[in-house]
């Protein structure tokens, strides 16, 4: 019997349940169909060495991730959950992935390091993600140590230089490190101190922490914290509409930030305070509290359970522990649910019916606007198969008039899916005439209309002349007949009577004076005939 070849892509599909569980731990949701599409069709086109069958090489994954997270129109925010899940699979592989992960090569030899004191921490290394300060550049150059090939690649567009090997050859260096370690244990560092050196503790063995900042696992296996920069917050606020104006777009932005940055409780409050108004923030927090579920899996209103899952006051969650990270994952999920629920407006079907296709708008873009209106103004999910009929009817009736008429005349319309209707609408849209063709058609129609009007006027004129000619012919015929009778002798003579024939009843045997049919009695006055004068 033949053997089937197992690839990273086929392996993930065989263990799809584990993949979804790992994605859930990253606060994201992945679909099998898009998983296959991105792996086999999208990411190979980035030209970074990604094979169509997938790979668990962290170097290649990091390069794909940098393309996905690219800011501006060149980024791919819809692929963020999928590449983050791929990275989690490769960084902390489950048992069924470990045979496919190449072993990490031993680190390159470095200068001898003196044994640290009992309270000293290992020498720190620069972060692989950008720090917004340039104080490191003032240090003298040191021998460069290449990062582990299994770790993520460095973004060459950032301001931070690659990590340098630190040689603690002096006792003063050790004293400084001990003092820094003591300070980090006593009180949490300020954002600037966090940027310069981070707050680093060894992670748990079963940790699945994402590699995105503010919480990020460094190349040396130490957890680093990078707070939001003021420039990021400023750009997010000024380059996106407000929550009241377009809740869907701002919710998508915050969801992307929650996925990629893995923010702490304080970071979430800073993010909400920057992007939302006070009233919007209170509404989001209220809806998030309603989404908390109890031990039975149902929504709960118990204050202790709500405060434990979604606290309004600063909790004592330690993100360096597994328990603390689990609390943060649940908090971010509830916060996202609150954003989605608070962004829904009261049901208003009139708003949905008011969404019509623009003159030059493509059917696909119109469908996206229509679905967004369903999400915003109705409690229905347009992606739900049960709502496909309603969305299809709205798509037909609210399309452009020329497209809507042709869609209504399609054969077997009831069996058409929404995708079929969109494809037909795209065909109709692409066959539309250009403005020049439309002007030419209108000009021809006007000329044809004028030609028809002239022909109709000429036809009516000919009919009028024909009718006038017939009347004149009848009149002339009457005159001619009268003249002919006058020439033949004037009035016609009365027929001659027999000797015994009555002139009144034309019967024989009596005369007119004795005719029994002739009325008797006095003769009445003869009516006078009135003559018309020229004045009348």
From Swiss-Prot:
Site, Cleavage: residue positions: 129-130, 213-214, 476-477
Lipid-linked residues (N-myristoyl glycine): 2
Location of the motif PTAP/PSAP motif: 109-112
Compositional bias (Basic and acidic residues): 449-464, 484-517
Keyword Phosphoprotein attached: yes
UniProt modified residues of type Phosphoserine: 190
Residue ranges annotated as motif PPXY motif: 161-164
Transmembrane annotation, as ranges: none
Region of interest called Interaction with mouse PIAS4, as start-end residue ranges on this chain: 343-391
Keyword Zinc: yes
Region annotated Disordered, chain positions: 139-218, 449-536
Protein name: Gag polyprotein
Organism lineage: Viruses, Riboviria, Pararnavirae, Artverviricota, Revtraviricetes
Name of the gene this protein is made from: gag
